[in-house]
Every structure is written in C-alpha cells, then in structure tokens.
C-alpha cells in the first residue's frame, strides 16, 4: 500500500497526487469514494461528556479501573470503534480496536506524524518562564519542529556502531544488578523481596544513564547512592505516576494548577535541573580529556548530541530517562515471569546463551549478540503476552474512513492493540508462552503452525511504526538482551506464586503482584 503525505486533507490534494503517480491516483480515488459513502463523524457511538465524567467519579463504572479494563468496557458497550469526548480542554479521541483501521491510519499519517499522550509534558514545557524548550520540545513535540529534532538525533541513536560502544558499560551495570540480587535475596528461600521492581527500575535507570548522561549514577553499586541520583530517580517515578491522572482521567490542570499537576511540575523542574547539572559535568569531562590529548574515535551519544546543540543534549537526556525506564522495566519483569513459569523455555535459552560464552565471567561481544535468535524470540513473545502499553496514539494525517465512519484530518486516535495480541485467531494458542512462533520455520517443518500466515503486521508494534518509531529501540533491545542473557547464565529463575492478572494498566502496564522471584545460583 502507498504511503501518502496529505497536506490539507485528501480532497485538496487528489489532483496533484493523480498527476504525479497513477497508482496514488487510484488510491486517492478509493479513499474519496469511501468518504462519500461513509457515515458522518457525529454518528460515532460513544458516551456523552456527562456519562464519561460521572463514570470516572466515585461509584461510576470506570472509577478505579485500569485503562485496559476501561477499554474493555468501551469495546463491549460501543463495538470496534467509538468516540470518547474530551473533558476540560482534552481533545475528543476515537478509540479503534480493528487492526485494518490501524494500517490505514499509519499509511496516511504524513511526513510528521502527530502523536498524543504527552500533553502534560508539552503543557509544562510551554509554560516554563525561561522558554528553554522553545523550538526544542524533544521527543514529545510534533510537526516540523519535531521533525527537525528527530532528524538530528536519528543518526546518533539509530546507528549500530553507536549502540555497540555501550556494550561494555551496560555489561558493567548488569554485573552490578546480578550482585545486587545476591545481596537482597533471602539466604534460605533465595527469593528477592516483593518490591523487586524497584531494583529492576534501578537497573534500567542506570542503563539509560550510561547513554543519556554518559555516566553511571550509583543506584546499583552503592549502599548510599549520591543524593542527586536518588532525587532524579524519585522524580522520574513521580512523573510517571502522574500521567494517568493528568493525561487520561478528567483533569482541570490546563486551567488551574491542580495538586497532581503541582507535584508533576515540581518533579519536571528538578529533572531539568539535575539533567542540566549532569550535562554540564559531562562537558567539563570532555573538555578536560581534550586538553589532555585523550581523544577517542568513538564519541559517546552525549558528546555527539552536544556537538549538534547543548539544548538538544539536555532535552534528549531528559526524554530518554522519562521514556526509557518504566517501559523497559515492565518489559524485563514480564520476560522474567514468562521464563520462571516455563522452565523448559528457560533451559533452551540458557543453552543458547552458554554456547556463546567460554566461562561464567566471559563478556558478550557484538558478534555474540547478533547470533542469539532464541533470546530475541523470548523477548518478542513476552512483549506479545505482556505488552508495555495498551496501544499507539496518533492524530489522523488525512481525512480517512475507519469502520465506515468519516474521520477528519487532525482527529485524535488511539489504536488499542493489546487485546488482539491474545486472540487465538491471530496467534494460535495465544495465551501460551511459545517463543518458537517467532523463529524461522524450514520449508519441510510439519510442526504446529504457531502464527497466522495472514497476520497483519500492524497488530504487533511494540516500538511503534514509521517516523515516530521509538528512537531508542536499538539501545532498549541491547539492554533487554544483555539483562536476560546474564540472568539465565547466572541463575535458575522461579516464581512460586499466582500470576493471575499480573499487570495493572494506568498510563503504562505495571506489575500488580509482588515480584518475589527465586534466584538460585547455577553451578558450573
């Protein structure tokens, strides 16, 4: 299918598209024909503003429900598509549960796709009195300004050689994580405390910091970590905890500074101050090395960003920390749960990992990481069963018809794919953890078919799609692969408790059960 860039709606550009490309002409005509025969936007099913507001209050049907449960109710009440009206300055949003509409949205999103979900961050950055973020909203921005910033950071963060230089620093952080597990687990039961998610968060925070700030911060290594590192970590937690109340639930923060927004704003202020301090320290280190003639052919991500623009380096450090800690931690926790509950899969993974290492203390090389297909399959399957978020947000890049309804350009959309990932019609035995479904099959393989051959690729997009694909994907991949590989080569992992409803969904999925994993040292 063709990718269209529509500047002022489909009908405004149809003649231009037809002139340039006959295939584009037929596609535009198809969309125009759909539009003429579609139902008007005003007929979309959905609750009224009052029903929605009342539903989120005490005693309402949505009160205290996770976002995934709210969406289940929407789907049950209204079907595959519905309009959720905006409250208190929030834009109305079309929720769609149909993968065919996902593809149409992505294929017509335009040169600079508009993504929602970060309105509280944008609001804060626009309101700062010093206007630091003017013309530099970072990863949370939209439009031409976002396109300019993204074009600047893509060559830095998406190139393999830049990711490879973090192999050793991340392995060092991983060794600290393994040592930390041995310190905090119970000597008799070998189980870690129920708040083990905090330790995983420390791991991902330190891993991101090695890239974003070009340094370790000491949360895993030191019993009493530096206060500025602890404060930065706590403020990231406050930020993420505020997103649901500010970005999903009805909130007046756009008009008056609510208590939640005040807390959010203070956290953002302190994140900015701390990241600026660390970036300034990095500049001093770089200048000192340069004056001493200590040059390095492989400049760090932070050094490369500083060469582009200091402001961009600070903003990207903030955005990587805000976007790369909770998401990766949730992914790692899900992988561990799946491996703990499927010991035969864990053993197969361990055998693959050990086949690349000469000893327990050997370090992975870049070549090693390229030749671990089962490890990557384990991660893919886990992200299918336990996704990090419930879907992807966009604004319609053109006038389109979704499920028979006219959706005007600019309409906010939420493509909710998390339910589809567990649909047996799409993934046979969908509720089972089967990494093998992601491995290439030989032509003569007669084993069970574990993947629908007609599967639409737009169902499974854990890192997004197109120009707005996660800019840190390669770094996150490396982080997850190293963490899981190091854990299975050091420990046999068990989880001896119920995993019923293991995650709750607010803005992101988070563990809903105590992560009391049992880590038993392996003997070699």
From Swiss-Prot:
Give the InterPro entries listed for this entry.
Answer: CYP11_CYP27_families (IPR050479), Cyt_P450 (IPR001128), Cyt_P450_CS (IPR017972), Cyt_P450_E_grp-I (IPR002401), Cyt_P450_sf (IPR036396)
Keyword tags: Heme, Iron, Membrane, Metal-binding, Mitochondrion, Monooxygenase, Oxidoreductase, Transit peptide
Q: Where in the cell is it found?
A: Mitochondrion membrane
Tell me its EC number(s), please: 1.14.-.-
Name the Gene Ontology molecular function terms of this record.
Answer: heme binding; iron ion binding; monooxygenase activity; oxidoreductase activity, acting on paired donors, with incorporation or reduction of molecular oxygen
The residues that hold heme are 470
Q: What is this protein called?
A: Probable cytochrome P450 12c1, mitochondrial
Could you give one GO CC term from the UniProt record? mitochondrial membrane
Name the major location. mitochondrion
Q: Which family does it belong to?
A: Belongs to the cytochrome P450 family.
rRNA processing recorded as keyword:
no
Kindly list the cofactors needed: heme
């Amino acid at each position: 299918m063709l990718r269209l860039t529509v500047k002022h709606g489909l009908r405004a550009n149809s003649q231009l598209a037809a002139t340039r490309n006959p295939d584009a002409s037929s596609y535009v005509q198809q969309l125009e024909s759909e539009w003429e025969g579609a139902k008007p936007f005003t007929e979309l099913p959905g609750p009224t503003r009052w029903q929605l507001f009342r539903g989120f209050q005490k005693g309402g049907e949505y009160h205290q429900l996770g976002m995934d449960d709210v969406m289940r109710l929407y789907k049950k009440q209204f079907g595959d598509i519905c309009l959720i009206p905006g409250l208190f300055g929030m834009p109305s949003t079309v929720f769609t549960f149909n993968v065919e509409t996902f593809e149409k949205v992505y294929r017509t999103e335009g040169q600079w796709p508009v993504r929602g979900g970060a309105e509280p961050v944008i609001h804060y950055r626009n309101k700062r009195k010093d206007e630091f973020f003017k013309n530099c909203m970072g990863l949370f921005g939209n439009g031409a300004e976002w396109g300019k910033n993204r074009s600047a950071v893509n060559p830095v963060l998406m190139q393999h050689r830049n990711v490879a230089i973090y192999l050793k620093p991340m392995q060092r952080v991983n060794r600290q994580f393994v040592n930390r597990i041995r310190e905090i687990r119970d000597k008799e039961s070998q189980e870690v405390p129920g708040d083990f998610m905090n330790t995983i968060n420390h791991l991902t925070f330190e891993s991101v910091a090695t890239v974003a700030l070009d340094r370790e911060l000491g949360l895993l290594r030191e019993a009493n970590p530096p206060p500025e590192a602890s404060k930065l970590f706590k403020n990231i937690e406050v930020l993420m905890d505020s997103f649901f109340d500010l970005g999903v639930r009805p909130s007046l923060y756009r008009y008056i500074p609510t208590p939640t927004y005040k807390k959010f704003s203070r956290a953002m202020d302190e994140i900015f101050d701390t990241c600026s301090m660390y970036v300034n320290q990095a500049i001093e280190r770089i200048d000192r090395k340069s004056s001493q003639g200590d040059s390095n052919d492989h400049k760090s991500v932070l050094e490369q960003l500083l060469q582009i623009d200091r402001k961009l380096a600070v903003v990207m450090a903030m955005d990587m920390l805000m976007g790369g800690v909770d998401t990766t931690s949730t992914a790692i926790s899900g992988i561990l749960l799946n491996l703990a509950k499927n010991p035969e899969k864990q053993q197969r993974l361990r055998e693959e990992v050990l086949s690349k290492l000469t000893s327990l203390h050997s370090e992975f090389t870049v070549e090693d990481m390229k030749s671990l297909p089962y490890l990557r399959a384990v991660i893919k399957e886990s992200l299918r069963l336990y996704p990090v978020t419930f879907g992807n947000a966009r604004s319609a890049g053109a006038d389109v018809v979704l499920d028979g309804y006219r959706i005007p350009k600019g309409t906010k959309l939420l493509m909710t794919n998390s339910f589809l990932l567990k649909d047996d019609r799409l993934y046979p035995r969908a509720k089972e953890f089967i990494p093998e479904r992601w491995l290439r099959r030989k032509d003569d393989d007669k084993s069970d078919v574990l993947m629908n051959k007609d599967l639409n690729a737009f169902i499974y997009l854990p890192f997004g799609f197109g120009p707005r694909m996660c800019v840190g994907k390669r770094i996150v991949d490396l982080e997850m692969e190293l963490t899981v590989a190091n854990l299975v080569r050091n420990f046999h992992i068990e989880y001896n408790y119920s995993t019923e409803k293991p995650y709750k969904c607010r803005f992101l999925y988070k563990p809903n059960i105590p992560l009391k994993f049992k880590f038993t040292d392996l003997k070699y």
